[in-house]
Amino acid sequence: MSSNIKLAQKDYKGDKEFAAALHGKEGHKKHGLGAVMSKNKDAQAAAVEGFFRNWGDKDRSKIEDADEQGRIEDYAGLTKHYYNLVTDFYEYGWGSSFHFSRYYKGEAFRQATARHEHYLAYKMGIQPGMKVLDVGCGVGGPAREIARFTGANIVGLNNNDYQVERGTHYSEVQGFGDQVTYVKGDFMQMDFPDNSFDAVYAIEATVHAPVLEGVYSEIFRVLKPGGVFGVYEWVMTDEYDESNPEHRDICYGIEKGDGIPKMYKREVAVKALENVGFDIEYQEDLAADDAEVPWYYPLAGEWKYVQSLNDIVTIGRTSRLGRMVTMNVIGALEKIGLAPQGSRQVTEALEDAAVNLVAGGKKKLFTPMMLFVSRKPEDKN
């Protein structure tokens, strides 16, 4: 697909006002079901409509091309509305690092999460004092962990005001000062000058780009010559067959449940990196091997891998049984008016995502951790 995508109009003032209306001025300090129940009902309805309007039938074979094109053209609005709706659920189930990890026997969930972040920083060679950009930083869990691990100064870029506020709050509470900061912005059209950063990384975030060349070209632009870009990319693997209806349904379930305009295959990511000028120094699908503990085990609810009391809580929430409990509780709260309309619909989309992520993982059709480490040549600007 061409990278000639119409960029979203920037309306930072309007975005901030909408986030304040939806979440409240102190919403970033609330957690779990309390945060879900505190949303403004009118703003929640607008967010639900804004997210679901470009999704058609559940069966991808019945989807019109116009639906997909609409999502691609509305990439910024789609992603902003998605994270306005799901951030509280993500934190409730997963913590402050919104990504999957490799797991080893005897390793607790939080330990694996931190190691996965450390591994990326290690492969990139991030050093103390470097100025590093985290593209699509979520609420800043990885940024804070990598800052601790490396001593680098991290700038988190995020187009969702609610997540920027939450990340800023967590970093202030944890005493990071100026070492970890957050900036509102669209990663398809960053507001940073050319050659601003020593290194750039993205953890399962650039999948929200309408086309990968667009976001990769912006990363290339803001990276200093000789700088390194590391990414855990979500891609469909070489095993994925677009002509296979089962494969298409799995892909569509992942797209809809995770707010993704369009999923691409591994080869598309490779070509996109090369086309914008990067030299790929390392690439590996970290989910390709038959690991004893699969990356999707928290969603599959495989209790035999639980290693700690914290894991019991986490897997209790992320497993299918835990998700069903959450969905029904949210549905009941919605019926009696304590949760905004559309809350259960959001949990249903997240459930669809979880089921298809597990299916995609088991069939080796999808990976959330296609690792690329690429470098901007010294003579390129």
Swiss-Prot record:
Q: Which GO terms describe its cellular component?
A: endoplasmic reticulum
Single GO molecular-function term?
sterol 24-C-methyltransferase activity
Q: Which family does it belong to?
A: Belongs to the class I-like SAM-binding methyltransferase superfamily. Erg6/SMT family.
The EC number(s) attached to this protein equal: 2.1.1.41
Q: Which organism is it from?
A: Yarrowia lipolytica (strain CLIB 122 / E 150) (Yeast)
Which residue windows are transmembrane per the record? none
- A Pfam family that this protein carries is Sterol_MT_C
* CDD domains recorded: AdoMet_MTases (cd02440)
Under which pathway is this protein filed?
Steroid metabolism; ergosterol biosynthesis; ergosterol from zymosterol: step 1/5
GO biological process: what's one of them? Answer: ergosterol biosynthetic process
Q: Provide the alphabetized UniProt keywords.
A: Lipid biosynthesis, Lipid metabolism, Methyltransferase, S-adenosyl-L-methionine, Steroid biosynthesis, Steroid metabolism, Sterol biosynthesis, Sterol metabolism, Transferase
Q: Which named protein is this?
A: Sterol 24-C-methyltransferase
Please write the reaction equations for the catalytic activity of this protein: zymosterol + S-adenosyl-L-methionine = fecosterol + S-adenosyl-L-homocysteine + H(+)
